[in-house]
Amino acid sequence: MRGELPNKHHSYTFFVFLFFFLILFPDLSISVNTLSATESLTISSNKTIVSPGGVFELGFFRILGDSWYLGIWYKKISQRTYVWVANRDTPLSNPIGILKISNANLVILDNSDTHVWSTNLTGAVRSSVVAELLDNGNFVLRGSKINESDEFLWQSFDFPTDTLLPQMKLGRDHKRGLNRFVTSWKSSFDPSSGSFMFKLETLGLPEFFGFTSFLEVYRSGPWDGLRFSGILEMQQWDDIIYNFTENREEVAYTFRVTDHNSYSRLTINTVGRLEGFMWEPTQQEWNMFWFMPKDTCDLYGICGPYAYCDMSTSPTCNCIKGFQPLSPQDWASGDVTGRCRRKTQLTCGEDRFFRLMNMKIPATTAAIVDKRIGLKECEEKCKTHCNCTAYANSDIRNGGSGCIIWIGEFRDIRNYAADGQDLFVRLAAAEFGERRTIRGKIIGLIIGISLMLVLSFIIYCFWKKKQKRARATAAPIGYRDRIQELIITNGVVMSSGRRLLGEEEDLELPLTEFETVVMATENFSDSNILGRGGFGIVYKGRLLDGQEIAVKRLSEMSSQGTNEFKNEVRLIARLQHINLVRLLSCCIYADEKILIYEYLENGSLDSHLFETTQSSNKLNWQTRFSIINGIARGLLYLHQDSRFKIIHRDLKASNVLLDKNMTPKISDFGMARIFERDETEANTRKVVGTYGYMSPEYAMEGIFSVKSDVFSFGVLVLEIVSGKRNRGFHNSGQDNNLLGYTWENWKEGKGLEIVDSIIVDSSSSMSLFQPHEVLRCIQIGLLCVQERAEDRPKMSSVVLMLGSEKGEIPQPKRPGYCVGRSSLDTADSSSSTKRDSESLTVNQITVSVINAR
């Protein structure tokens, strides 16, 4: 007995120590991964459920304010990253809430015992159930017996929020009547359902769509046996194994990672972009390895029917062989809304098929699919169906199999450099150079000669009429009245739709006779052409008194040219600023519409920045810094100091002109819009502008504001510093645009890496390189191109930052449309914190057209 007393003493000591240890350190108590029918989880207890391997954690949380949610996040990751939220649309309004099992259902109750959320299971009620958090992040409800552990009564994987985890399925479960899809958060701090969804459409051949307000934004393309046809990168993901299942019971996509110790997720962010992340343990941050949409061609139906998008061409939209623009003038100016139409009408039974290679095939929601036949039978099936317009294989494995045929219009196709799919488009035989019969040739010859005679007569009459007009020595009667009728009676239309000017207000703008313009430009001689714009040609001219002018002759055929003419005359005639181009007069004669500007000797900024000529040597750093300041002051005048609050909407290097002293002047106000003083933003069904300069919210959702111009200014600043275009910029070994390249260098403390070599050329006597000014401009440029509009500074702040050498400047966040493989900042990495760098949440609006140049 004596020998046992010391052992008992040690046992008592151990239990006393353990008791006090657990009291003093409750957070270090053993975590559980289950919740039984007799247990509960409350906000006040601050307890959580942890998966067996400590990978995931479930508990109550809040981000801002008094709204509480039940969610799941990664346990071992320092950055709180939420992957599932139970009551996302029914938050608890105060810190009194409880999760428990009631009647074989999981329920969340508020302080009045009201059901805030429930699993809503019906039918036979089991006597004993238990909830469990698994190591794959799945929160399940199952029977409490050991042999029932694999039978889930309910699981969170069937009800995703904004994130898809490995082993989680996205798509339809026909057997259980489930449709699993992800929905964005409403904002960075609000987990409730946002405006964007990524879900499966099973009409035709199953494929995923990105939606906003049930309007398609982008499309994955159908599964072709190896990958989704619009996501070629899938075959390059060595660390991920993906699977697509299509049978009577389900149509679903899922993935898993090869390294079971690594973390990966697929998340739709607050602006609708689908992003793939992989956790980097050494860097302790999320690495974004993929996202969609990644470029303009990913936007759904961007080029309209019978056209394809190709990022390697300019313009990016191209009519398919055998088709032509309905309005060539509009198409050439960048307006692709006029659609493509057939050059030659089809003749059923005689038509042939043209092969388009390396394509993302059109949307299949209205297509007919037959997986039992091959390509040859598919061609015959399409040929005998007179309304069939195209066909392709449904599966590209083993030489191809299956058949898709499109009836009527098809849209949303793009061309890849390689690895795309073959699409066969139905064309008239004449498009292949088929020989016509003798009778057909004779008929064609007769018709052709007749048309030539008629056309010659019309041209002769037109020439005589023009000659008569050219001899006139005075403007026609009512010349000023006609201009007033064209311009003034329409008024200046503000973004709200209200007319700013009425018939009683007269334009204080000199009018020039057409004959004077003809003489000044030497009858619009080609030798006097300064440039060609989207709506016409600009000529250099000299008046009789020796004054040099720039003459903008708008296209006679373009209705947009007329609209631009009206808008520019109404706006710029009332604006006076040293950094805005000055409109001297205008001229309207017959169908001619002409604007006359001051002539600026040094031309446009882009000719100095991007063309390898001697003119680029004029741009030492002091000149560039002066240009940046001048553009900023001009924009500030438009946004704040002018009579009207004006949004330019097309600020770019080619729309900044330089006088003999290299003073910058903003030009081309044809796309500008006027705001009320208390108006902050507006939206449009027709997005106009230039790719590379458009802000994300404007390009994708049609929302524009002063912050849209700020974004364009930021792009322009980085182009001035680097001497490189944002659009078309490619860095060796990377897939970034200029914004992404600048951002990566800035994060690594290598901001000066992007600077134009001409600026730092020590051998140049003109070089006055100031590194601190350059870095300040790069930082300001990055602030201006931040993804969220609300994060961008106003132009008043930009002017102040440019002029202050000692003032503290905020650190920028990730830019909008940052292309390429990149690692997110620590502050931008989780589903809660990562959203801080995302764009402003947008309203549910309709964007029917993007008209960019």
Swiss-Prot record:
Feature: compositional bias, Low complexity: 822-832
Protein's cellular compartments: Cell membrane
Modified residues (Phosphoserine): 558, 654, 667, 831
Main subcellular location of this protein, as a coarse class: membrane
Annotated GO MF terms: ATP binding; calmodulin binding; carbohydrate binding; protein serine kinase activity; protein serine/threonine kinase activity; ubiquitin protein ligase binding
Domain Bulb-type lectin, residue spans: 34-154
Stored SUPFAM superfamilies: alpha-D-mannose-specific plant lectins (SSF51110), Protein kinase-like (PK-like) (SSF56112)
Catalytic activity, reaction form: L-seryl-[protein] + ATP = O-phospho-L-seryl-[protein] + ADP + H(+); L-threonyl-[protein] + ATP = O-phospho-L-threonyl-[protein] + ADP + H(+)
Residues passing through the membrane, by range: 442-462
Glycan attachment positions: 46, 120, 147, 243, 387
Residue ranges, Extracellular side: 32-441
Residue numbers on the Cytoplasmic membrane side: 463-853
InterPro entries given in the database record: Bulb-type_lectin_dom, Bulb-type_lectin_dom_sf, Kinase-like_dom_sf, Pan_app, Prot_kinase_dom, Protein_kinase_ATP_BS, S-locus_recpt_kinase, S-locus_recpt_kinase_C
Active site: 650
Modification Phosphothreonine occurs at: 684
Family stated for the protein in its record: Belongs to the protein kinase superfamily. Ser/Thr protein kinase family.
Name by which UniProt lists this protein: G-type lectin S-receptor-like serine/threonine-protein kinase SRK
Organism: Arabidopsis thaliana
